Amino acid sequence: MKYELVVGLEVHCQLNTNSKAFCGCSTRFGNPANTNVCPVCLALPGALPVLNRRVVEDAVKLGLATGCSIAPSSILARKNYFYPDLPKGYQISQFEEPICTEGMLRIDVGDGCRDIRLIRIHIEEDAGKSIHDIGDDTYIDVNRCGVPLLEIVSYPDIRTSREASAYLQKMRQIVKYLGISDGNMEEGSLRCDANVSVRLFGAEEYGTRTEIKNMNSFKNVEKAIEYEMQRHIDIIDGGGTIVQETRLWDADKGETRSMRGKEFAHDYRYFPDPDLVPVLVDQEMLERIRLELPEFPEDRERRFVSEYGIPPYDAGVLTVEREIADYFERTLTVCGDAKAASNWVMGEVMRTLKEKYLDIKEFAISPERLGGLIGLIGKGAISNTIAKQVFELMQTGEASAEEIVDREGLAQVSDTGAIERTVDEILEANPKQLADYREGKTKLFGFFVGQCMARMKGKANPQVVNDVLKSRLDG
């Protein structure tokens, strides 16, 4: 391919504060339309904004996490434009003096890591929402007006659609680890605009870019960028000219369509907001927030390998989400077996979460109860097969694994005499299979094990069953 893709991303991260950026209204998603409002949200005359301190702290957290320089003083500015869902006629944002500048995000794209530079992270407020699907009219819901956002702007360092998706996934992971956002793309907590252009390989100058909006999933980000790249190439190869514009991604049709001409900074007539004082971040605040930062995914992954001895793959899976990593460590504290805890969390726990569309916080089995279940397996009190039955029962109540085993009579049978009697009965009932085994069809060993376990309702100690069978079959 003679063309090189060039992409820069603008990510809007909605903060999970209880109140809005410049007033005390709730930020709760899903409330009835126009109920999370006040004179500030509605831009009523005389209503003055007051900056939410938590918004500043969250911006500093993300800035530190991405290696940015934190400005001791930054300015809130008015971004002026008209839209029906923007009551003030301007959006409070930052322009010439943002709170965070010059950071970096390292992404893993499978065949190695790449560093994507960040131009800036700045504070801004969200706009309202236009609702077009009620009859023939358009309605305005201003609940979202003033909800705090951080806009993260990257340099045009991204060269493939896969890198763009990896960047967005990494950013989502970081904001979730920091606890500043839930990163939910479907609800709009994490939104992404892509500035896409192409140029000849080896060229220094960037091509004319288009901005792509309305990408609400990682997969759609990849598809939209791929489509737009090919659209640019087709136009250039056909002798045409790329128009700098904003385009909307249509996931149903798998294409972008023109939305409006691309605005420039001067179109918004930015100027410092006279109603708001500069945002100050002193050294004491900076150091306090630095000490509050969590252990980040890469560091935690390395520690899981070195401290617990689990494989790098397991450590990578367990640390993708902070809550899963926390759950694993609390489970391990109880059971003391890192590999067993890893297998259960990655296996049965994650399977259940996926099947039931649950978050780990909603999962019925606490890590302490799961640790108790794994401990019973380690002591030989129950088999893995029985443990899976107990696991299902634990989701329907608060009983411990031990209580369920006692109540249901599921304790493992390790009595050699009882197992020998069962083995003898199975061998007597299957003379053909016994003869075939002794003639060399040794794969039938698994058949006999299965028959014994079924006869004893899965409660027999598998190791004892294996030992008794070997002595009977090979003796």
UniProtKB/Swiss-Prot annotation:
Keywords of the record: ATP-binding, Ligase, Nucleotide-binding, Protein biosynthesis
Keyword Repeat included in the entry's annotation: no
PROSITE patterns, alphabetized: GATB
UniProt-listed Pfam families: GatB_N, GatB_Yqey
The enzyme's E.C. designation: 6.3.5.-
Alphabetical list of InterPro entries matching this protein: Asn/Gln-tRNA_amidoTrfase_suB/E (IPR017959), Asn/Gln-tRNA_Trfase_suB/E_cat (IPR006075), Asn/Gln_amidotransferase (IPR018027), Asn/Gln_tRNA_amidoTrase-B-like (IPR003789), GatB (IPR004413), GatB_C_1 (IPR042114), GatB_Yqey_C_2 (IPR023168), Gln-tRNA_amidoTrfase_suB_CS (IPR017958)
One GO term of the biological process aspect: translation
Molecular-function GO terms, alphabetical: asparaginyl-tRNA synthase (glutamine-hydrolyzing) activity; ATP binding; glutaminyl-tRNA synthase (glutamine-hydrolyzing) activity
Parts of the chain that traverse the membrane: none
Main enzyme class: ligase
Catalysed reactions listed for this entry: L-glutamyl-tRNA(Gln) + L-glutamine + ATP + H2O = L-glutaminyl-tRNA(Gln) + L-glutamate + ADP + phosphate + H(+); L-aspartyl-tRNA(Asn) + L-glutamine + ATP + H2O = L-asparaginyl-tRNA(Asn) + L-glutamate + ADP + phosphate + 2 H(+)
Similarity annotation: Belongs to the GatB/GatE family. GatB subfamily.
Function statement: Allows the formation of correctly charged Asn-tRNA(Asn) or Gln-tRNA(Gln) through the transamidation of misacylated Asp-tRNA(Asn) or Glu-tRNA(Gln) in organisms which lack either or both of asparaginyl-tRNA or glutaminyl-tRNA synthetases. The reaction takes place in the presence of glutamine and ATP through an activated phospho-Asp-tRNA(Asn) or phospho-Glu-tRNA(Gln).
Self-association and partners: Heterotrimer of A, B and C subunits.
Name by which UniProt lists this protein: Aspartyl/glutamyl-tRNA(Asn/Gln) amidotransferase subunit B
Naturally occurring in which organism (per UniProt): Chlorobium limicola (strain DSM 245 / NBRC 103803 / 6330)
Lineage start: Bacteria, Pseudomonadati, Chlorobiota, Chlorobiia, Chlorobiales
Gene name for this UniProt entry: gatB
